[in-house]
């Protein structure tokens, strides 16, 4: 994997790529809010010698800093497309965990025919119809919660709340420690992320996935209403849904072998 950069009007994005044949399928890994490229370490290890792979530190996250919080979900999707173009990628398969899944759906809205596959890991649909007015109201008001909650407790609840395995919890803790001593930045990242998510939902766009897709969700995912959303998403769209038994919100870190196998089977069926 080679670390690379892409300049935007708001700052520089760091990403890692291993691309041997740009015209083959490329797995594009998109980490969730406040996580970084390390979230997918177990997936990268498994796939980097078999497939083209790309993973980023999302704007304002980890090494993609300093970065102005003057962008929305669609800017993220456009910058992602610019990065794929920079690498000559023609057949991206978006694999997004949580907020990363929302980036994938925004990408599908902007570039309906570019995406060759979509895997949602503990994410949820972007369509307005799935969320209540109260949920949207709350999303817009999360920053002060993260800013004023004692950091020690935030670290504990943040890492223990998203994973059930020691590996998954320790990894989330490590990723959160990137912001140790700068809780304001952590709160800004989280608050801004939730606000741009709410704004994308309020746009009330179709966010239709026109390519092959797969939903993955941990049975112990207690982040927001992920389990409820995934049941409804599957019911309404008929996109296949696989439950990861005993896994939390970062199910790819709790049961990496199972998630890797699911991704492998999924891409094998994409022409």
Question: Language-model segments: which ranges?
Answer:
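Post-His helix in hydrolase/transferase enzymes
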Residues: 253-267
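Active-site loop/oxyanion-hole signature of alpha/beta-hydrolase fold enzymes
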Residues: 54-95, 261
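Gly/Ala-rich beta-loop-alpha elbow adjacent to hydrolase catalytic centers
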Residues: 96, 100, 104
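Conserved alpha/beta-hydrolase catalytic His-Asp/Glu region
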Residues: 129-131, 149-208
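Conserved loop-alpha-helix segment in the C-terminal half of the alpha/beta-hydrolase fold
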Residues: 214-247, 253
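Conserved HGGG/HGGXW glycine-rich cap/lid loop of the alpha/beta-hydrolase fold
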Residues: 11-63
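N-terminal cap/lid segment of alpha/beta-hydrolase-fold proteins
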Residues: 1-12
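Flexible "cap/lid" loop of the alpha/beta hydrolase fold
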Residues: 109, 116-148
């Amino acid at each position: 994997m080679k670390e690379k950069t892409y300049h935007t009007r708001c700052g520089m994005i760091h990403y890692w790529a291993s691309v041997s044949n740009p015209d083959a399928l490329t797995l594009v890994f998109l980490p969730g809010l406040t996580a970084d490229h390390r979230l997918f370490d177990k997936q990268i290890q498994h796939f980097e010698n078999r497939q083209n792979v790309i993973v980023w530190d999302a704007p304002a996250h980890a090494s993609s800093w300093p970065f102005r919080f003057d962008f929305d979900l669609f800017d993220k999707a456009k910058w992602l497309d610019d990065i794929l173009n920079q690498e000559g990628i023609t057949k991206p398969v978006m694999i997004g965990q949580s907020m990363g899944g929302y980036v994938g759906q925004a990408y599908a809205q902007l570039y309906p025919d570019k995406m060759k596959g979509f895997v949602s890991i503990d994410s949820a649909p972007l369509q307005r119809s799935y969320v209540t007015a109260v949920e949207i109201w709350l999303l817009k008001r999360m920053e002060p919660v993260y800013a004023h909650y004692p950091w020690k407790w935030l670290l504990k609840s943040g890492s223990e709340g998203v994973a059930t395995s020691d590996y998954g919890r320790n990894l989330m803790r490590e990723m959160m420690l990137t912001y140790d001593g700068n809780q304001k930045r952590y709160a800004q990242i989280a608050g801004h992320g939730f606000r741009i998510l709410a704004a994308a939902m309020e746009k009330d766009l179709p966010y239709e996935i026109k390519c092959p897709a797969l939903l993955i969700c941990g049975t112990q995912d207690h982040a927001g209403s992920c389990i409820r959303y995934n049941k409804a998403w599957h019911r309404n769209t008929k996109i296949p849904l696989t439950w990861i038994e005993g896994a939390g919100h970062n199910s790819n870190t709790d049961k990496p072998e199972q998630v890797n196998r699911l991704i492998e089977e999924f891409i094998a069926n994409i022409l």
